């Protein structure tokens, strides 16, 4: 009898600072792992955890916020390291603050990510009311050109199941690799990038 196999993918939570990436990371994990705060730049290094979903394993990565305007040397360094990290992912969960709508900054950062040729799922976060969702739906999202757009409220843990279902569906349709439980840890390549 062969060993049971699992679909495996590296999935990164990506976006500009202060859109709720770390809260979303914790929400998907179901426990507090990343530090969260109400000001930009809380996550300057990345966090990662293995998310076990029956026959599906996700190496979930919470990345530092990307900026379109790089003013300081530290901004440039963080952007470079984050983009190096993103280049090693299979799927990007691109997070937008739904209360802000589609801004020029989101478009500029998304364009940078798109050039890395990764599968992108658009996550509209901080959607605590139907009014916020309806207002966002009036925005022109055609620029992003992605089939998957999911509304979530990480703070209230809403929309998580939709994200998980979409991730599993994407991995199945795109033939991501299968690994056995015994070789999962060996097969999972560590992402050795640090921002100091």
Range-by-range predicted roles:
Residues 1-75, 79-85, 173-196:
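Conserved G1/Walker A P-loop phosphate-binding module
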Residues 9, 26, 58, 80-87, ...:
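Solvent-exposed alpha-helical segments within well-ordered globular domains of core cellular machineries
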Residues 31, 54, 66-67, 85-95, ...:
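Generic N-terminal helix/loop capping motif
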Residues 41-42, 65-67, 99-101, 126-131, ...:
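Conserved nucleotide-binding/hydrolysis micro-motifs of P-loop NTPases
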Residues 59, 89-96, 113-128, 145-152, ...:
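Conserved beta-strand/loop subsegment of P-loop NTPase cores
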Residues 69-73, 98-108, 131-136:
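Conserved ATPase-coupling elements of RecA-like P-loop NTPase cores
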Residues 118-121, 126-181:
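Canonical P-loop GTPase G-domain recognition
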């Amino acid at each position: 009898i062969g060993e049971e196999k699992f679909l495996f993918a590296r999935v990164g939570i990506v976006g500009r600072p202060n859109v709720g990436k770390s809260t979303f990371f914790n929400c998907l994990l179901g426990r507090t792992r990343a530090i969260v705060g109400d000001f930009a730049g809380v996550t300057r290094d990345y966090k990662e955890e293995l998310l076990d979903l029956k026959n599906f394993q996700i190496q979930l990565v919470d990345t530092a916020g990307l900026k379109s305007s790089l003013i300081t040397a530290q901004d440039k360094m963080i952007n470079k390291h984050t983009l190096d990290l993103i280049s090693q992912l299979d799927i990007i969960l691109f997070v937008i603050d739904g209360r802000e709508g589609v801004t020029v900054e989101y478009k500029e950062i998304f364009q940078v990510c798109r050039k890395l040729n990764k599968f992108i799922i658009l996550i509209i976060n901080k959607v605590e009311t139907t009014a916020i969702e309806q207002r966002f739906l009036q925005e022109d999202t055609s620029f992003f050109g992605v089939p998957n757009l999911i509304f979530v409220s990480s703070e209230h843990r809403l929309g998580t199941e939709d994200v998980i279902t979409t991730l599993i569906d994407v991995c199945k349709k795109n033939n991501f690799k299968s690994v056995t439980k015994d070789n999962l840890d060996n097969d999972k390549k560590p992402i050795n990038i640090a921002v100091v």
